[in-house]
């Protein structure tokens, strides 16, 4: 059962440190809330809004509630293989994954001109900031598309309860998503001064619907979400190709690709609200209660946060249900 900390704050967190709790309490006092702040099972301290929280707002958006890795999420592909059909020695697969999926801080593919896939060409540039992008940022967009990144991002070959082989991947919008988010959070601070927003934390500054700064953020956020989705798709294609190199009869049977750092405008009880979610990795299902009293949620824990291993770039580490994991540098 959730813990109702106050009328505007509900927590499902089994462990919540004092810093994260104080941060969530500050968020719960914002005047733009459309419902209570909800903390997920492993919520923890972050920039402005708590990582592992859902913060629904009305007529405004809170960039820090979306997070600095806009569109970060998971993609999982089920294959026709079972554990018994995998090679006994997975070193070759590990090497292929390392070669085909760049991992680590700032890592990407070669030169920009060699990485302009049709998906990337169709994506274009972030519309809210296109005129302000430097040549280096434009290059970063190209060379980092199809790369893992750092922190708790990973690609993993694992097994389900039927011993069916899956590939699971965790990544987001890479350097450009972080840069866009950081720039818009700074803009929100300036807007807060203009609007005389009363803030307990300047990183809880919001953008009011109808302002040009709001429109610019939404357009860039949606672009970064598409970039992150495509980034995961490209890496998953590369990972499956690597798997087929060691198991040629492997067939992809289904794929699930979803964000967990995002915002979407939804209608609840006849009222339009923005639902930013800055939540750890894992499946999530949410429904808005008819009384608009709270968000209900059922979800798994974060991807590698609570039980993370500090490893060198792209080193295999064991995980529950895992055959092999390619882990980015922490």
Q: Could you say what each language-model-derived stretch is?
A:
Residues 2-23, 32-39, 45-51, 55, ...:
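Domain-length cofactor-binding catalytic modules of enzymes
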Residues 28:
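Beta-strand elements of modular eukaryotic interaction domains
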Residues 41-42, 69:
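Acidic active-site catalytic centers that drive phospho-/nucleotidyl reactions
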Residues 65-128:
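A generic, well-ordered mixed alpha/beta core segment in the N-terminal half of proteins
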């Amino acid at each position: 059962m959730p813990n109702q900390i106050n009328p505007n704050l509900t927590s499902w967190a089994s462990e919540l440190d004092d810093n994260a709790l104080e941060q969530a309490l500050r968020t719960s006092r914002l005047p733009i809330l459309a419902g209570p702040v909800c903390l997920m099972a492993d919520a923890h301290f972050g920039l402005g809004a708590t990582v592992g929280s859902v913060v629904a707002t009305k007529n405004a958006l809170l960039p820090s509630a979306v997070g600095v890795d806009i569109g970060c999420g998971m993609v999982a592909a089920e294959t026709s293989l079972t554990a018994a059909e995998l090679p006994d020695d997975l070193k070759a697969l590990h090497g292929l994954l390392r070669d085909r999926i760049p991992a680590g801080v700032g890592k990407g593919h070669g030169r920009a001109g060699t990485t302009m896939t049709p998906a990337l060409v169709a994506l274009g540039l972030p519309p809210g900031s296109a005129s302000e992008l430097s040549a280096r940022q434009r290059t970063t967009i190209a060379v980092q598309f199809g790369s893992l990144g750092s922190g708790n991002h990973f690609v993993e070959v694992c097994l389900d309860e039927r011993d069916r082989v899956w590939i699971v991947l965790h990544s987001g919008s890479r350097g450009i998503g972080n840069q866009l988010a950081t720039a818009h959070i700074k803009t929100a601070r300036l807007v807060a001064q203009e609007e005389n927003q009363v803030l307990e934390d300047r990183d809880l500054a919001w953008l009011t619907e109808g302002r040009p700064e709001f429109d610019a953020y939404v357009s860039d956020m949606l672009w970064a979400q598409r970039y992150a989705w495509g980034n995961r798709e490209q890496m998953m294609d590369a990972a499956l190709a690597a798997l087929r190199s060691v198991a040629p009869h492997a067939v992809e049977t289904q794929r699930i690709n979803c964000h967990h750092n995002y915002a979407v405008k939804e209608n609840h009880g006849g009222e339009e609200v923005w639902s930013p979610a800055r939540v750890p990795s894992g499946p999530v299902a949410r429904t808005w209660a008819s009384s608009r009293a709270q968000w209900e949620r059922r979800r798994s824990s974060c991807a590698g946060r609570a039980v993370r291993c500090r490893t060198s770039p792209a080193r295999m580490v064991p995980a529950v249900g895992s055959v092999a994991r390619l882990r980015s540098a922490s």
